[in-house]
From Swiss-Prot:
Disulphide bond pairs: none
Ranges annotated as spanning the membrane: none
Pathway: Bacterial outer membrane biogenesis; lipopolysaccharide metabolism
Gene field: ais
Gene3D superfamilies: Phosphoglycerate mutase-like
Descriptive protein name: Lipopolysaccharide core heptose(II)-phosphate phosphatase
Enzyme Commission (EC) number: 3.1.3.-
Cellular localisation: Periplasm
This protein's record includes keyword Transport: no
Length: 200
């Protein structure tokens, strides 16, 4: 009888441990994947990826002035003062882990301003190919990467570009908010989507 009780208690103990492990695994899965099905890549994970191969991070621009009641920075087609603060905060966090990158933006005021505030003085190259997005965006990314194959790349673009890439590469429905981003890389001439960038 005593042996049975000990066996029963032992079984319950193992069961509780298994439940705890399952709960932890569930939390890890929740943290690792977005609700849209894209892997979540935080700053530290991005830094580890960048050690394996150069990364390409595409961000949507900051809060646009013409769709907000917040104070405009300057031009109504640009971003808000809040947008500049958000872009600078994101840039500081990003640069702490990925200090070396080439910076690009599409040829709109809002993306140029976002990239400028994000980078805090880094040289910016404006490239109109990141305004109208479709399959050609991959050629543009590969072109930039081929010019500096060992450099990380940051591109400020638009929500429709990010939505297109997520759907095309992973069949994911991605509706990016301001300054949301996607992480990609180029390998053997092909562009791969690694996941959604999460700033924390």
């Amino acid at each position: 009888m005593l042996a049975f009780c000990r066996s029963s208690l032992k079984s319950k103990k193992y069961f509780i441990i298994l439940l705890a492990l399952a709960a932890i695994a569930g939390l890890g899965t929740h943290a690792a994947w977005s609700s849209n099905g894209l892997p979540r890549i935080d700053n530290k994970t991005l830094a580890r990826l960048a050690q394996q191969h150069p990364v390409v991070v595409l961000f949507r621009h900051a809060e646009r002035c013409d769709r907000s009641t917040n104070q405009c920075l300057s031009d109504i087609t640009g971003i808000t003062v809040k947008g500049t603060q958000d872009a600078r905060e994101l840039g500081n966090a990003f640069s702490a882990d990925i200090p070396d990158f080439d910076l690009y933006s599409s040829n709109t005021v809002r993306t140029i301003q976002s990239a400028t505030w994000f980078s805090a003085g880094k040289k910016l190259t404006v490239d109109k190919r990141f305004l109208q997005c479709g399959n050609d965006i991959y050629s543009a990314i590969k072109d930039l990467q081929s010019k500096a194959p060992d450099k990380n790349i940051v591109i400020f673009t638009h929500n429709h570009c990010l939505t297109y890439i997520a759907k095309d590469k992973r069949d994911a429905t991605f509706k990016p908010d301001y300054l949301n981003g996607l992480v990609m890389h180029v390998e053997k001439g092909k562009v791969y989507l690694d996941g959604e960038f999460v700033n924390h």
